Amino acid sequence: MGHDAVAVREKQLQVWDVSDDPRWRLTIYEPLYGGKIFANIGGPALLDYMGAYVGLGPEHSALELGSGMGDACEYVASHFGCRVTGVEMSTQQIERARDRHPDSSSRGFEFVQADMLQWEPSERYDVVWFGDMLAVAQDRRVLLERVHRWLRPGGALTITDIVAGPDISEKDRAFIWDADGFDIPFQADSLAQIRDVGFQELDVTDITQTGVTINETILEASYRHKTTLVEAVGADEWLAWVEGAKEYRRLFAERKLVCLRIGTHRA
């Protein structure tokens, strides 16, 4: 299944632009992260892994792609003391990030509104990270090539990547597109792409169970807050949210979708 670039971009912006509504807040941010905004499977666990994998400290500079509302940038800057840049394409998301973190520059992190396939940084970084962004990149290989170029020699890439299990169906793929606007490669193809651009030694951990757990939490919270959510978004939108979480829970539980945490270094 393939989709043209304009359709992909429009679909993804539709998803991201509503990521501060009560469904996300009451069923993801609050029950999973105590109100902090992490909108990918990696969450703060990916950031802690990155800190240990890289040995992050004040002497380092870090770059997040798809920085959303900025909470991950704040987490990395405050926990590890390094300088952080977050790049985000969505106008609404970058405005939310700046509203949430008005003192970011004094705390060591900044936000840039840009398309990561067109933007060029003015410096090289010690680490680049993102959660689930390869799945939504219009050209995975080009993005990986750019990231490799943006890293200093020995710099690290740490990501979570959602890939297709061997038994995924076209019906499953159609659901993923309708829900979130992305296509996914098989695991072997995704890892080969990462290696092909120059990242040879990959530290790969299967965290698919996290996808199951997250969607179970979404379902429990959706029913617990049903009255509030129906009042906020309507019964049809509430039901669609619940059905989406059920379907994603199934896809992860049956390993039609697989989630990987990956760390690697540029030579």
Show which residues each predicted segment covers:
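Short, glycine-/aromatic-enriched active-site segment of Class I SAM-dependent methyltransferases
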Residues: 162-181
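A short glycine-rich, Lys/Arg-flanked "PGG" loop and its adjoining helix->strand segment in the class I
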Residues: 141-156
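Conserved class I S-adenosyl-L-methionine
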Residues: 60-68
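Class I SAM-dependent methyltransferase SAM/SAH-binding core
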Residues: 69-117
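Conserved alpha-helix/loop element of class I SAM-dependent methyltransferases that forms part
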Residues: 40-58
